[in-house]
């Protein structure tokens, strides 16, 4: 995992060029954190993320102290406190020994030989027995954050490929599929171990071949490798082998035909006939293998359809169970009773509305009826000419002239009574008799100025 100086300088922090700062960071830790916690925590906070980023840049999920010392060498010096940093990362759960990481492997991993990871190095065992806190240089540690990233990328690559139609793959097929994700076989094994922890992968060994089974999309966890899985895998391998054989025989038959043409041009008719007979034999063999290939494909199609039918049946069963739960307590009698109650309430509401409508005063007649009535009124209305009297046809008699002059006639008229004056009934009777006498042509009685009625104000 050695990296060139040019690549390292591209992702190292700016403090890497500060000699004074790096002299402090390259120095050893104090024996006890309580002596100077600032010094201790400052170095841990610098080296921990740098180690993780270094592994991410290299594409690895494992790290050991020897590689770190070599890659972090600066001006001939190596960091003296990386062993303490590794121990701190172990306590915080950022890294884990390979042996501890693979502690829960199943029999499939052991059959692969991955169980060798469980054997702790002798140096580490002796160090633990002697109470030494130093980390062996060659002890490998798994960076938990990075192995989870690799596992997620591997699962996404499988589900996005054409191989996702197959649940069981050979390790070599998976190795080819993940070559751009996992640079080596060890990294791939670590990613598979993480996927196994997440219940997305299980492994097995069949007739000396390493097999990996993935969980399908929509499944919460992967199921163990069954005899059905192995049978399907063998059929798929047979299909692939037959396709390769048929293709090879096709090329061989074509080659024999071309050779027969060449010999015929050279005048070697007998040899050309032998090549042509060989071509026919190859074609017959290819046809026989092609028929076998079609049979295998038909079986695989039937298996796929049966699996689809099984999923459909499971969906039906789940649907029936859900309907049974949702319809619990619902009966036809209850439904009819509810419908009758609803109809009864609707009838009651209609009766109430009719009662309220009949008791209310007439809001008015229809607008069309009102328009008709207005039109009839207009037709029956009197014309404007009828408002004036008819023109007389005989001579008009001039008004009769009185013998009294106008001034005398005005004086002859009684004064307008003043409603504000206090006039008694006797005075009104006397005034009425006077007017009656005046109308008969008798001389009117003089009225004192005090008794004369004043005009109305």
From Swiss-Prot:
Where is the signal peptide, in residue numbers? none
State the superkingdom: Eukaryota
Report residue spans for region: Disordered. Answer: 381-401, 435-457
InterPro entries, alphabetized:
Snf7_fam (IPR005024)
Q: Which Gene Ontology BP terms does the record give? A: exit from mitosis; late endosome to vacuole transport; late endosome to vacuole transport via multivesicular body sorting pathway; nuclear membrane reassembly; protein transport; vesicle budding from membrane
Recorded GO cellular component terms are:
cytoplasmic side of plasma membrane; ESCRT III complex; multivesicular body; nuclear envelope
Q: Which residues form a coiled coil?
A: 234-266, 331-382
Residues crossing the lipid bilayer are none
The record's keywords, sorted A to Z, are: Coiled coil, Cytoplasm, Nucleus, Protein transport, Transport
Q: Does the keyword Cell cycle apply?
A: no
Give one Pfam hit by family name.
WHD_CHMP7
Q: Which cellular compartments is it found in?
A: Cytoplasm; Nucleus envelope
Which function does this protein serve?
ESCRT-III-like protein required to recruit the ESCRT-III complex to the nuclear envelope during late anaphase. Together with SPAST, the ESCRT-III complex promotes nuclear envelope sealing and mitotic spindle disassembly during late anaphase. Plays a role in the endosomal sorting pathway.
- Which family, according to UniProt? Belongs to the SNF7 family.
What name appears for this protein in its UniProt entry? Charged multivesicular body protein 7
Source organism: Danio rerio
């Amino acid at each position: 995992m050695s990296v060139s100086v040019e690549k390292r300088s591209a992702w190292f922090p700016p403090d890497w060029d500060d000699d004074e700062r790096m002299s402090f960071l390259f120095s050893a830790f104090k024996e006890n954190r309580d002596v100077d916690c600032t010094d201790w925590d400052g170095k841990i906070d610098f080296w921990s993320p740098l180690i993780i980023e270094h592994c991410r840049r290299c594409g690895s999920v494992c790290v050991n102290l020897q590689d770190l010392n070599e890659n972090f060498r600066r001006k001939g010096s190596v960091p003296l406190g990386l062993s303490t940093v590794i121990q701190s990362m172990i306590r915080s759960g950022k890294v884990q020994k390979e042996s501890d990481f693979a502690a829960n492997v199943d029999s499939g991993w052991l059959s692969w030989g991955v169980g060798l990871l469980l054997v702790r190095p002798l140096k580490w065992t002796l160090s633990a027995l002697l109470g030494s806190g130093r980390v062996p240089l060659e002890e490998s540690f798994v960076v938990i954050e990075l192995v989870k990233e690799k596992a997620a990328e591997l699962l996404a690559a499988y589900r996005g490929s054409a191989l996702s139609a197959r649940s069981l793959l050979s390790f070599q097929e998976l190795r080819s599929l993940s070559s751009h994700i996992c640079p080596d076989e060890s990294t791939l094994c670590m990613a598979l171990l993480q996927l196994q922890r997440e219940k997305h992968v299980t492994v097995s060994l069949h007739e000396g071949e390493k097999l990996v089974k993935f969980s399908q999309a929509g499944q919460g966890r992967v199921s163990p490798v069954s005899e059905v899985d192995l049978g399907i895998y063998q059929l798929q391998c047979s299909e692939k082998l037959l396709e390769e054989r048929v293709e090879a025989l096709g090329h061989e038959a074509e080659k024999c035909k071309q050779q027969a043409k060449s010999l015929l041009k050279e005048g070697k008719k007998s040899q050309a006939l032998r090549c042509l007979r060989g071509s026919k034999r190859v074609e017959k063999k290819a046809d026989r293998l092609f028929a076998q290939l079609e049979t295998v494909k038909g079986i695989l199609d039937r298996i796929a359809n049966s699996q689809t039918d099984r999923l459909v049946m499971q969906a039906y069963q789940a649907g029936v169970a859900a309907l049974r739960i949702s319809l619990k307590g619902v009966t036809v009698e209850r439904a009819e009773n509810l419908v009758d109650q609803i109809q009864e309430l609707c009838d009651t509401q209609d009766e109430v509305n009719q009662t309220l409508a009949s008791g209310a005063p007439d809001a008015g007649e229809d607008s069309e009826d009102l328009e008709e009535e207005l039109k009839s009124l207009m037709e029956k209305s009197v014309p404007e000419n009828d408002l004036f009297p008819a023109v007389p046809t005989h001579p008009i008699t001039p008004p009769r002239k009185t013998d009294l002059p106008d001034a005398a006639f005005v004086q002859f008229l009684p004064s307008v009574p003043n409603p504000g004056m206090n006039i008694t009934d006797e005075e009104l009777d006397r005034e009425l008799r006077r007017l009656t006498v005046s109308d008969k042509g008798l001389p009117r009685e003089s009225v004192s100025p005090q008794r004369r009625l004043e005009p109305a104000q």
